[in-house]
Amino acid sequence: CFSGSEEELKETKHTQPCLFAMEMAAYEVLKEKGIRADSMAGFSLGEVAAAAAAGVFDLETGFRLVMRRGALMQEEAENFDTSMAAVLKLPAETVKRLCGEFSQLYPVNFNGPEQITVSGLSTQMKLLADAVKREGGRAIPLKVKAAFHSPFMLEAAAGFQKELEAVEVRLPQTVLYANISGEPYPKSEAKIRQ
């Protein structure tokens, strides 16, 4: 985390454990200061940290899950030349339409009314950037080497699901919101694994 090169840290097998460690360290500092959350949520990898902080599993289990998640996603990333970009200053409908003009570009994160993250093939991403500019928007390449949150990660998601099924989980000790639905986690350990 602290001594790796930028290239090494761009590899998700390294990035994810580093981010998880930083998130959990920040949580522990807040806890030491007596700050307690009424509820928790995390986006993408952050949901694993939020689940660990909420007591769904212990820190060591969370770290093992993150290591495996990063490795699975790295394997998929190495199969394709993919990337991501943040598209700014265009409405979601325009971004969806532009992505639809390409065979393997996907609007994946709707971060705000005019900030949508797109994942897909790097060759198509470059063409999308030109199309976005013609529409009056801006595409900012993200410093990642994979198309996260897209169909390019389906095998990794299936592998991670198997990992989750083998882990002992508990009900959250505080309200924990799922990033897929925005709803509190279910009151069922079996459903938490989903």
Label the model's feature ranges.
Residues E23, D38, G42-G46, A50, ...:
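Gly/Ala-rich beta-loop-alpha elbow adjacent to hydrolase catalytic centers
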Residues C1-A41, V118:
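Helix-rich "cap/lid" substructures immediately adjacent to catalytic or cofactor-binding pockets
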Residues V29-K33, A51-F57:
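Alpha-helix C-terminal capping segments
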Residues G4-S5, Q16, A54-Q194:
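Alpha/beta catalytic cores of group-transfer enzymes, especially the acyltransferase/condensing modules
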Residues L19, A26, E47-A50, L72, ...:
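Hydrophobic side chains within alpha-helical segments
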Residues G34, S44, E168:
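Conserved functional loop/turn residues at catalytic and ligand-binding sites
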